[in-house]
Amino acid sequence: MSDTIPSCEACRPDAEKVDPAKLEKYLSQVPEWRLEERNGVQMISRDYKFKNFALALEFTNKVGAIAEEINHHPELVTEWGKVRVTWWSHTIKGLHELDFAMAKRCEAVFNA
Amino acid sequence: MSDTIPSCEACRPDAEKVDPAKLEKYLSQVPEWRLEERNGVQMISRDYKFKNFALALEFTNKVGAIAEEINHHPELVTEWGKVRVTWWSHTIKGLHELDFAMAKRCEAVFNA
């Protein structure tokens, strides 16, 4: 068995950005997530609310664990009672379908 | 023994903001930290760099632990290879001397 870290499909230089029609469809599947743009790069993000800092940090760690599993990493903003998760694909400077799959996994982790 | 969560001295409504003279002195003691302002609220922040996501998240957890200990919480932005720590005192909408003490503790954690 190889012990190489699996490469993330969304992080390949030839990975395809989600096209506008699919973007709309995918966004409708994660209604709590909003589309944003930073320096021309499209991203999706959601704020998750918690009762205290410890629960927020626990969620950050859970999302960190799925990120490590897939080797695709979000930005995680942890504060007292809140975690903002933002997904995008650095290499293609935009959104890959994996970003939406990861958003769905975040929903599953939060609702578990 | 009381099991009440200790209140953070910087989070009392009558806590004092650091005055401009002290601000300059305190900033010089944490030269890696920069002063910033969001919506009129002064904050201090530093980007810490790491070799991967796991090490970044580990640092986030270490800073989270000292935050819980003091019951004063920063904003922690965790990404692949980077953690941005930002301290300020929400209640007084600015910087308390405790924010600088916490910045120093972050330095100690990072350099340990």
UniProtKB/Swiss-Prot annotation, chains A, B:
User: Keyword set for this entry?
Assistant: Lyase
Any Gene Ontology biological process? tetrahydrobiopterin biosynthetic process
Q: Does the keyword Lyase apply?
A: yes
Tell me the Pfam families matching this sequence: Pterin_4a
From the UniProt record, list the reaction(s) this protein catalyses. Answer: (4aS,6R)-4a-hydroxy-L-erythro-5,6,7,8-tetrahydrobiopterin = (6R)-L-erythro-6,7-dihydrobiopterin + H2O
Q: Which GO terms describe its molecular function?
A: 4-alpha-hydroxytetrahydrobiopterin dehydratase activity
**This enzyme's EC code(s):** 4.2.1.96
**Keyword Lyase annotated:** yes
The entry sums up its family as follows:
Belongs to the pterin-4-alpha-carbinolamine dehydratase family.
Name the record gives this protein? Putative pterin-4-alpha-carbinolamine dehydratase
Organism in which the protein naturally occurs? Hahella chejuensis (strain KCTC 2396)
